[in-house]
Amino acid sequence: MGEVKWTKEQQQAIDVHGCNLLVSAAAGSGKTAVLVERIIKMITDIKNPVDIDRLLVVTFTNAAASEMKERIGKAIGKELTKHPKSKQLQRQLTLLNRASITTIHSFCLETIRNNFHYIDLDPNFRIGDETETVLLKGEIIEGIFEDLYEPENCTQEFLNLVEFYSSNKDDVALQNIVLNLYDFVMSSKNPKKQLQDMAEQFNVDESYNFGESKWAKVLMDDVELELSGLKDMMEEALKLINDTNGLDAYLEGFTDELLMINDLILNAKTSWDSLYNGLSEVKFGRLKTCRNCEDKKTQEKVKDIRNKVKKQLQDEIKKKITSYSTKEIVTDLRNLYPIMKSLCDLVIEFMDRYSKAKKERGIIDFNDFEHFCLEILGHEEVALKLRQKYIEILVDEYQDSNYVQEAIINSIARRHEETGNPINVFMVGDVKQSIYRFRQAKPELFLKKYNSYLEGENAKERKVNLFKNFRSRKEVLDGVNFIFKQIMSENIGELEYGDDEALYLGADFEQYEDKSLVGGPIELNLIEKSKDETKEEESEEEEILSNIQVEARFVAKKINELVNPKIGEPFKVYDNELKAYRNVEYRDIVVLLRSTSNWAPVFTDEMKENLIPAYADVGNGYFETVEIKTILSLLEIIDNPRQDIPLIAVLRSPIASFTPEELIDIRLENKDGDFYGGLLKVASSEDRDDNWILFKRKCNSFLEKLNYWREKSIHMPIDEFIWYLYMETGYYGYVGALAGGMQRQANLKILFQRARQYEKTSYKGLFNFINFINRLKVSSGDMGSAKILGENDNVVRIMSIHKSKGLEFPVIILSALGKNFNMQDLNKRILYHDELGFGPDYIDLDKRIIYETVPKSALKKKIKLESLSEEMRILYVALTRAKEKLILTGAVNDIEKSAKKWSYALEGEDYKLSQYQVMTGKNYLDWICPVIMRHKDGEVLRELAGIEIFEKVNLLSDESSWKITTDNISGILQNDDETNEIILEDIKEIEDIEESSSYYDEINERLNFKYKYIESSKLPTLLTVTELKRMKNSSMYEDYSRDMYTPKLVKKPMFMEKDKKLKGAEKGTAMHAVMQKINYSEELTIEDINRQMETMVEKEFITKEQADSVEAEKILNFFKSNIGKRLLKAENVRRETPFHMELKSTEIYESLPKEIYENENIMIQGIIDCYFEEEDGIVLLDYKSDYFKEGQEEAIIKKYKVQIDYYARAIEELTGKVVKEKYLYLFYGDKEVEIK
């Protein structure tokens, strides 16, 4: 493999030193490779080699840091093969493991650990788990509100705040505002100061000049942008008037109105008062009549333009600016000040209490990482030490940095002696791919440097543009450039997309003999959704297809066309490993969606309907899965059974298996009370008939289980209890047998893991765990289903655009382009912005009316522009994931009406679309389709808009290539029929096969097929250790084909027993129950043991019969024995520990052929009576109450050896420690027996 040929710009990014360097790396430009090469060059420099641990490399994720280390390691290894004796390279390989290649959070954490004493932090601090911090925040915010409601603390400002921003029924909405505002300000360098400054913006007096405020500037800029759009429309109208005979009467009026708009634009650039006065005088005269115009179509178009301009200017812009005088604005601000101050005080109070609570618990959270680090770096000696250590700081994905992270980097950067500016920071990223504003990323940090840094060699602050794309085909790059050169600007996108920002071809794809099967134009497929007006005749299938399904089904057909040679020509992709073209596979195709919520499940279902293997990587839906809702309902009723909804959910589930009719009977027993009361009444009711007796027993059985589980939940850790419920109820195995069983079981495992994390916190108990889960749903959103897919699985992946960032795929299908942007946040009662502060609604409590304040209007405009800019960058990320083929799909309600709306693009003469029109776009199609309207390949769209072929339109000359198609429900269903016809034709081809045909034997063999692995279907999926012991001690256990694993009723039901005294096994169970619960912390006597058993009976842990069957003397003898004394001395004792582990079926059934059954696993479960730890290992102890004669100890050992060995193995897997000794304690003979 030859040496890498770096481009001129890449080489500059690798070689330039001695100044701050910003590398603007376009999508697919090889920025990671450049970053690695820059580091390698530095550590292998002959004159001034730099040790790898003298560099600070900051990455965005832990995965990126690991990949970076791996790449650097490989690069060093490669250099070592050239220079095997190089001590410098060997040293770098050694230093690599401790090199500072890390995320900013990891760097902050290391700085805190090394300098904790500067901020009075306990050196034994730990990182608070999300489980703990969610609960802690909830606890604190509730405590604050409770305190503030106390008469001595309650203020009118607080009550007004509650009135303003709480819902009608509770103050949860206000609590969430406080929590969200806390998260928001924590991305600033000084959160408390920012909050105070935000409140103080409302602290104004009568002399306040609103026109000088940031709010006024935003509104003026917005009005200027809107007016510019209206100006373009009026200029287009005047052009039509001048070019059309008979419209002269319109000329004077339109000209005057255009001049009026020009004056207003000048006013918007001048001052608030100038704009206010100008808009106050806006009037539109009556339009003169034109009787001689023969071109009625143009005349109507001109009138329509004027009506739109008039409506927008008078009803929207004028109303927005002139509704409030400056005096009224000042009054609103002054009235809002105490409310805003109260809100800020509330957030600061939360901040203080939360910090105090974390300190008391010895924990820190992720927000603390950056703020504590910044506080430590405020001590010059620490900053100086790090400044001297790091010769260069390299920041990856710089476009996603925030203000705190920027301050941290600047604190440790070396500085120019004269200017004081940083000189050793290398920043690489692409602001066009900054899509994490919701995580408080600040792309303006990148943009400020991008606009101020120079490209010259002598620049003290220098930038390099990497514009060559080494990922995608020319067709993809040309299409991306064609779109973004027209829509991305400083206003929307926050960057002017010009030649410097465009993508240029860097990849070299080999030629293929049939060019129609590779690459090709970008496809845009427009699908017409169901119109409001229903057709007179509509097929049943058309009626049941939802709009999302229509698009999903179309995408499925498109995938089949690409992959299935029977349906369409097989598309070819280039395989880098094979160094050749091959047929596209499902794993090469990714369907991207802006949001997977609601959409991904529909797409997955449609794929499955079309026999396409698909997997959706969704970020939500976890808490809505049946299995999780059922288990959470079970936990809720174990905590408190008097909750109707979760109780009914459990009763209807396979855990209890009650029928709807039985639930009705329960309700009828307690019509006015709760459902649990109904259950109790049925259980204690008089016998009526045979059916009622069985029903009553069913209720009693469930109540007994529920009471037992409630008792169990008190004494078991939550994670162990949840796993116990899975096994005890059989629900884990049940869901595994359903469709998608692996996914369902994986979801249950996630809940178990969450419980395990919860157990590590300072919170305990089932109630707190349920509270945590409920808070998690609200605060952190849904967790997303468990991941069960491997990277190499041959499936179509459906994922969000955010998840695809940094990845690349041969074929991208970007769907749901007709889905409107989500602007719901703009409707919240209060908005906030790091530059503009608060934007609240005002609520007149006397008149009970709510209205939008001027500050809120300003914030809505600002946040909308920033949101649209983010959406534009998200679109850029999506389009640039494609290597070879890009397919776009989107649905619209009325395709002709939409096309007419998009045709505005044909009216402008500038290359860029009207920024006003781009701003009014509601979805991605509103940006993409106007662009393609202006392309020679956009003829389909122009025809839909009613533009005749002979009409003169302004088309742009461009190398991009597009294929536009339109479809609707009927067309998609017809395609279904055509696909089915193809399959039917294949069947007909083999219909008349004679016996002598070469197919006969194959068909005969298939029809008489016998499953080769029939025995595997008879293997159990789960065994208890007791069953395993019984089988292995049986001479028949190797006969795995017997149906001995089918559950059998081997015990007579209790209600049929005449003599209800406890049998031997039941006595053993009673002894185990007592040994599990007995408190041996004090010196025991027979009286103590009897007293404890009485308490166990009172608490219903054991029955009176069970207590009577246990001899207290036997228990006392145990504790006097050698093994009992050792147990009493042990510090860590575990009793009744449930476990599960997987074993290979060939280990259990040794006669099974390994080559066939090697991958067949069986789940083993059991409960270990007792084990305890000593210094040199673990001692396992199992209690037995078997009757035996003197001298039969060896028989007992033989009987239980298998069981004890599995217990020991389970303990070693659970603890990672060695089981040094294994004992049976035989209560019958008061003997301990060691099992070797």
From Swiss-Prot:
Every UvrD-like helicase ATP-binding domain range: 4-473
One Pfam short name: PDDEXK_1
Gene3D superfamilies attached to this UniProt entry: 3.90.320.10, P-loop containing nucleotide triphosphate hydrolases (3.40.50.300)
A single GO molecular function term of this UniProt record: ATP binding
EC number: 3.1.-.-, 5.6.2.4
Gene Ontology biological-process entries: double-strand break repair via homologous recombination
InterPro entries: AddA (IPR014152), DNA_helicase_UvrD-like_C (IPR014017), DNA_helicase_UvrD/REP (IPR000212), P-loop_NTPase (IPR027417), PDDEXK-like_dom_sf (IPR011604), PDDEXK_AddAB-type (IPR038726), Restrct_endonuc-II-like (IPR011335), UvrD-like_ATP-bd (IPR014016)
Keywords assigned: ATP-binding, DNA damage, DNA repair, DNA-binding, Exonuclease, Helicase, Hydrolase, Isomerase, Nuclease, Nucleotide-binding
Cofactor: Mg(2+)
Complex and partners: Heterodimer of AddA and AddB/RexB.
Name the record gives this protein: ATP-dependent helicase/nuclease subunit A
Organism for this UniProt entry: Clostridium novyi (strain NT)
Lineage of the species this protein comes from: Bacteria, Bacillati, Bacillota, Clostridia, Eubacteriales
Gene: addA
